[in-house]
């Protein structure tokens, strides 16, 4: 049995299916005008619930990422994680060159020779939203991600915040420090109640709020999503819109799934996420993302199944 090394989404319990069937379904779902040249393809991959299991990435996922990249496709990571949480995943993927979108699109990172450099970043001063949320969500704790620091209002449960440079600071310091993302965690509240409360607050109209698979929310500047970050990068790289692919499972992936020419929801995605997708693949533990990548390789006539 593989040793668990990563804190990520637990298994969905989805029944396994033959990989060849998943590959054939993904191949059939690709748009008719999808490019046949890998150099005209951009594939954006979410991390948690998409390419990462607690034991790491599967061999098929690694084959897909490196097979596409070797063929000339632009394969990038698009995660809600801060850069500090993305770096260990890049290491596990042996992802040494390319691009990563962190903080749900607020932070664009160039990866070169295994070194990460922030190229663009959108920040905001959280100020009043912290007071509003703290009053409405009793017992909530906060994290702010101004690279390279991680500022916490109190320790997070189960070491849920990645990275080693944690500092417990006052709410005043959190409120006044520019950041690309604020995390809110309410460990003693169920997800549905947490989501309901946040949706009723002004912050849900003045900022982007993404609730995860637990009572955890990422808060970004209004208008900053994975889709906005990807569109900026697509234009920078000169990739045609018809060659864009996005694969994810969470509500923070909806924008990029809608943006892509081929938007894919994972098998572990909720009905809300699936409704925005062109195709639904298998869950992360059943190599759903790998099937999509191998289907693109097949369409482009490069190595793979």
Predicted stretch roles:
Residues 33-34, 38, 58, 220-305:
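Mg2+-dependent phosphoryl-transfer enzymes with acidic/Ser/Thr/Gly-rich catalytic loops
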Residues 59-159:
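Active-site phosphate-binding/coordination module
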Residues 1-47, 239:
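Non-catalytic pre-domain segments flanking phosphatase-related domains
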Residues 136-247, 251-259:
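Conserved acidic, metal-coordinating active-site core of Asp-based
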Residues 27-75:
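N-terminal glycine-/serine-/threonine-rich phosphate-binding loop
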Residues 49, 81, 248-250:
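Active-site metal-binding loops of divalent metal-dependent hydrolases
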Residues 72-76, 96-98, 181, 242-244, ...:
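Short active-site oxyanion
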Residues 95-96, 104, 205, 259-260, ...:
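Short, structured coil segments at secondary-structure junctions
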